[in-house]
Amino acid sequence: MGIEEKAGNLGIVTTTLETVVNWGRTNAMWPLLFGLACCAIEMMGAQASNYDLSRFGMELNRASPRQADLMIVAGRVSRKMAPVVRRLYDQMPEPKWVIAMGDCAACGGIFNNYAIVQGVDEVVPVDVYVAGCPPRPEALIDGIMMLHQKVMREKLSGKKEAPIRIDQPLVQVK
């Protein structure tokens, strides 16, 4: 049952410009991977064939922030690294999104000292938080799917919603 059957024999499909633009944004996100600790290993696992992030249009990992629209910060951010993270975020073109992957990126993790930023949201605005130490690839995929839902609700005016926190992965592993 395709879309042409739902629309009838008119040959016309109606939608809004926001829906088409947001659909395109969700299906062509190019991530800038910022792996700083053990969460980066799980992020690489999510790119493997077992999980296949290319089905979300994310097969192109960008090395340049000027070509990326999604920053995935995975791991702890030190005070010395914070200006670098901010500079890379500022170089990304609009619209841009950030996923904080892991407890260290979300809240500093177990490193409650002067050298570690207590959450990357002190440096850049975060759209989705993925909890875990380290979070499994399924949790990252859940976070990406939540970000897709958030992007589909965005208006062309550019106003963003509040961040989404994923406390536990939606996919349970037995």
From Swiss-Prot:
Report any one BP term from Gene Ontology: aerobic respiration
**Where in the cell does this protein reside?**
Cell membrane
> What reaction does this enzyme carry out catalytically?
a quinone + NADH + 5 H(+)(in) = a quinol + NAD(+) + 4 H(+)(out)
The GO cellular component terms are: plasma membrane; respiratory chain complex I
What Pfam families does the record tag this protein with? Oxidored_q6
Q: Where does [4Fe-4S] cluster bind?
A: 38-39, 104, 133
**Alphabetic keyword roster:** 4Fe-4S, Cell membrane, Iron, Iron-sulfur, Membrane, Metal-binding, NAD, Quinone, Translocase, Transport, Ubiquinone
InterPro entries, A to Z? NADH_UbQ_OxRdtase-like_20kDa, NADH_UQ_OxRdtase_20Kd_su
GO terms for molecular function, please?
A: 4 iron, 4 sulfur cluster binding; iron ion binding; NADH dehydrogenase (ubiquinone) activity; NADH:ubiquinone reductase (non-electrogenic) activity; quinone binding
- Summarize subunit and interaction data from the UniProt record for this chain: NDH-1 is composed of 14 different subunits. Subunits NuoB, C, D, E, F, and G constitute the peripheral sector of the complex.
- What role is this protein assigned? NDH-1 shuttles electrons from NADH, via FMN and iron-sulfur (Fe-S) centers, to quinones in the respiratory chain. The immediate electron acceptor for the enzyme in this species is believed to be ubiquinone. Couples the redox reaction to proton translocation (for every two electrons transferred, four hydrogen ions are translocated across the cytoplasmic membrane), and thus conserves the redox energy in a proton gradient.
PANTHER family, per this entry? NADH DEHYDROGENASE, NADH DEHYDROGENASE [UBIQUINONE] IRON-SULFUR PROTEIN 7, MITOCHONDRIAL
Entries under HAMAP family matching the protein: NDH1_NuoB
Q: This protein is called what?
A: NADH-quinone oxidoreductase subunit B 1
What organism is listed for this UniProt entry?
Answer: Chloroflexus aggregans (strain MD-66 / DSM 9485)
